């Protein structure tokens, strides 16, 4: 019998770890590596078995499964010409695939190299080990309790700044939607933010998932008596923040209520459709043969390791997807929507409205980040699907336009170089730095994710050491005020970043929701930290 190997994750019980010579230990994440390092236990990081080229191959392979729902066997999930299975957030799907495929290929390479007789592993990778073990004589032990896995938007991080500290509270998607509906109803009724259907025949601009305080000047410039402006935010409520409400009010930007659009017949049809597609889902999960063919790489089906994840997410969200299709279709039929603006095209909100829009409705994708500026990152930037976007793309500069045309073969007339509605205002702001008696240094770390395959122990170590090093450097200057601005994403690495900062000093202010423009305006020096760098 071959030797024993142990896989450890953050959820593993480390009290049973053996230190025998014939046992080899592999850590699966940064925290388990740190814990063993502190205990002085010899181990290897599993990720070291994958090189950069292999991670890039996994990234490109994962992208090929983005359109899995287009398989002819899944056409039964089309509702009003929209496939409900295709409404899953593209970033969520890609992150799931990257998480699973990276660990899948890592475990495969280790098992091929070590040929163990005994495998000890955490519960969450048992399916992978069972799928990859070469014979039934291999003994498998589980070293953790059952772990409930979730996708990014299964729970919502409700965030708020309290006395300079970011406070977050996780709530379920269902509870979040209920709270959001109550908040929208109360605030919109109080401040007159509801769209008046009397104006439905006037040309209307529809804005998707844009946070008003960040785009205050942009929204103010859109204010006009000639057309309506409606904003729809599902991921981040626009009525939760006082400044957001103020911006909406001043720019005459309105919210739309589903209750104003749905009649009794609509409600009945929606209810029947929810029941119909929920039943189809129950039948779908028994169709393993079809899924084995869809989710296959190099002759190996990885369907067993993602089945439960997709089953859970669609079971939870199918009713939401059905209702969102009816809402979008009704909106386009009752209101004269002439144009759509969005920052993304892969989110659930964006997908449903872009798929449901009438052919005469123009859509504009506003550039959001810097990644396309760099030759080395152009492969990863395809997650934004610029190359597949059907309508117009608005970018910051002619340089960006030329980059898209030359690297993604996008037609030049589809790209408009108009500047950045978010960042252009910075050049016109008057600095308030003189108000600060100290030299303010703003550090803005971007959290690590597995989206591009960068979530490695080595990157986490470099990230932590860099944050601590910067804190130590500026601590020596008494006239320096150090502040941090954390990206307001759903990434779990944000909690790790906060912990690193607070363990160093609880006195350092950490911001999450404050508009970055205001923080930059009041700072003398800005330092960004990114996983890619």
Q: Residue spans of the language-model regions?
A:
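Catalytic-core helical/loop segments in enzymes performing group transfer/polymerization on anionic/lipid-linked
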Residues: 1-533
